[in-house]
Design a protein with these regions (language model features):
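A short helix-turn-beta junction within AAA+ P-loop NTPase domains corresponding to the substrate/partner-engaging
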Residues: 148
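Portal/gating segments that form or line small-molecule/metal binding sites
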Residues: 1-145, 155-210
Length: 210
């Protein structure tokens, strides 16, 4: 069974809205789009290329699919490894309104999310990677369908904007399985779910020692 890996670009204060371009997502009056672009360098590109080569398919919400579809099909340089993989990989788009996805190969998922994701995880090789797709990502987290988090944390504070980990998600322990830092200061943390969250307290012993 393949793993579902959630890949997210986020600021230090957890904002994931509109990372790649000013007009990517202006919902809620957000006007700071494109905040990750100054930090893209050879090392971040190398990270992205390495991980996209591990993908067997890409799972996206409709808006993220349409945003990516407006750019990547037009990158036809045969030496661009990232574009080559993104364009050839199967895309699975969760949507109840999209009927004819133009960026192929693509399949629209309109049925029960948990059922469809379990089927996709049981069928095929390589990671099933989620990129962006804020609403979809929250649904996957809430239903316990994420096997690994790949969180790209950029050295910026935005102070406003949509966050991935909002109120209402189930408390969950995480285990760090990897961490990398780019030359530009981007830190990529990789976590896997570690079961229910546990709690404790600090108490001094009879001799006053912690």
């Amino acid at each position: 069974m393949r793993r579902l890996v959630l890949t997210t670009f986020a600021s230090v204060d957890g904002v994931m809205q509109s990372p790649g371009a000013p007009g990517e997502d202006r919902s809620g009056g957000f006007e700071m789009g494109g905040w990750l672009v100054p930090y893209v360098d050879a090392s971040t590109v190398a990270f992205a290329v390495e991980w996209i080569q591990q993908a067997g398919g890409i799972l996206l919400g409709r808006r993220s699919y349409e945003m990516l579809a407006s750019y990547w099909p037009h990158v036809t340089d045969p030496d661009d490894v990232l574009a080559r993989h993104l364009n050839r990989l199967p895309k699975y788009v969760v949507s109840t309104t999209l009927t004819d996805p133009a960026w192929r190969p693509a399949t629209v998922i309109a049925g029960d999310l948990a059922t469809e994701i379990k089927r996709l995880k049981a069928d095929g090789d390589g990671e099933l990677q989620v990129h962006g797709s804020r609403r979809l990502a929250r649904s996957l987290i809430g239903q316990g369908l994420v096997d690994e988090y790949r969180l790209w944390v950029f050295p910026v504070l935005l102070g406003a904007g949509e966050r991935l980990f909002g109120d209402g998600l189930p408390p969950t322990g995480l285990r760090m399985v990897g961490s990398r830092t780019s030359e530009s200061g981007v830190v990529v943390h990789t976590y896997q779910p570690a079961g229910p969250l546990t709690f404790g307290s600090f108490q001094a012993d009879a001799d006053g020692r912690a």
